[in-house]
Amino acid sequence: MKKVLMTGFEPFGGESINPALEAVKRLDGKKLDGGEVMICQVPVTRYESIDTVVNAIEQYQPDIVITVGQAAGRAAITPERVAINVDDFRIPDNGGHQPIDEPVILDGPDAYFTTLPIKAITSALHKASIPCQVSNTAGTFVCNHLFYGIQHYLRDKSVRHGFVHIPLLPEQDASGNQPTMSLDLIVEGLALLAQAVIDNESDVAITAGQIC
């Protein structure tokens, strides 16, 4: 039985909710085929985010870690391909930090690739008619910071990890101009995503690239 740790960020940037946290809370204790989900709430704070998830990993000893965050402007669930060693925050985090062009980890490598089967994930969600596509940038805010930091922590461990961005909820789109996804569909998608990771020790060879 695989243990799947799924994490979600608290609200930030003036929002009262974060779909990542709302979705993972619904998945707490969910039984999968060959696995079970446990969850962790993550502060949107530069240093505490990594420490919080590392502590959860040490507590739960998971086989798989899936970190989740919201991405305004995206219409699909987007597993991230790569984390980069750059903090360049457009807005302050919830602790008031706003680094500019600073490394996530001093003397760390330029980037880490996900160890989740992102092509298998997109295939599984497409079969369920849930919008999903591979993303090649996790940004330079706390999402990328956490993605990079946890990949660095797990670099010599057998635990698989990757970051997934999800769309806003309809109630977050006050202007009516942003793409959104219902919480029910996000929850369904994340459950299928976790199952795809359990089912695929290695990724499948299908195209998911972009021209630019």
Curated annotation (Swiss-Prot):
Reaction(s) catalysed by this chain's protein: Release of an N-terminal pyroglutamyl group from a polypeptide, the second amino acid generally not being Pro
Gene Ontology MF annotations: pyroglutamyl-peptidase activity
Keyword terms, alphabetized: Cytoplasm, Hydrolase, Protease, Thiol protease
A cellular-component GO term for this protein: cytosol
GO biological process: proteolysis
Active site (record annotation): E80, C143, H165
Cell compartments where the protein resides: Cytoplasm
Subunit structure: Homotetramer.
HAMAP family documented for this protein: Pyrrolid_peptidase (MF_00417)
Function: Removes 5-oxoproline from various penultimate amino acid residues except L-proline.
Name of the protein: Pyrrolidone-carboxylate peptidase
Taxonomic source organism: Vibrio campbellii (strain ATCC BAA-1116)
Upper classification of the organism: Bacteria, Pseudomonadati, Pseudomonadota, Gammaproteobacteria, Vibrionales
